Amino acid sequence: MKTVATNKAAYHNYEILESFEAGAALLGSEVKAIREGRISLKESYAEVRGGDIFLVKCHISPYEAANIFNHEPLRERRLLLHKREIRKIGQKIKERGFTLVPTKVLFNDRGKVKIEIALVRGRREYEKRDVLKKRDTDREILAEIKKRSR
């Protein structure tokens, strides 16, 4: 699987509880633009509406060669999941504090676009600082271990 884009802000701003891999109903020009890496997941999120999940505010830049048949960069895109997964996600989102955020866009082995969405809970400012401190100390410990093993 080839990862095209990641939502680094999601890993920083949210605590990821569970992730799902979803297909996406895209136009041909959108798939070609994604293949070129012209996609941004910043500020994008997913929402459950009428038994379907939609990806909102995901920016896919227009494909140069598509001229008049090009797509709208910020249109809402339907995500494809099993009904039971959609129901499960819908129930979790109704609980207070949960959000659905895209974390990765990738191509699977068959060349299909897949979007990894995650059920997340927002982090407070002090939690973000704690995570950064822990990451730094872990990195220092690993560097020290590596240094001593030489």
Say what each PLM segment does.
Residues 7-10, 38-39, 65-77, 82-84, ...:
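Arg/Lys-rich, often Gly-containing low-complexity segments of ribosomal proteins
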Residues 33, 40-50, 54-83, 88:
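Ribosome-associated translation termination/rescue signal centered on the conserved GGQ peptidyl-tRNA hydrolysis loop
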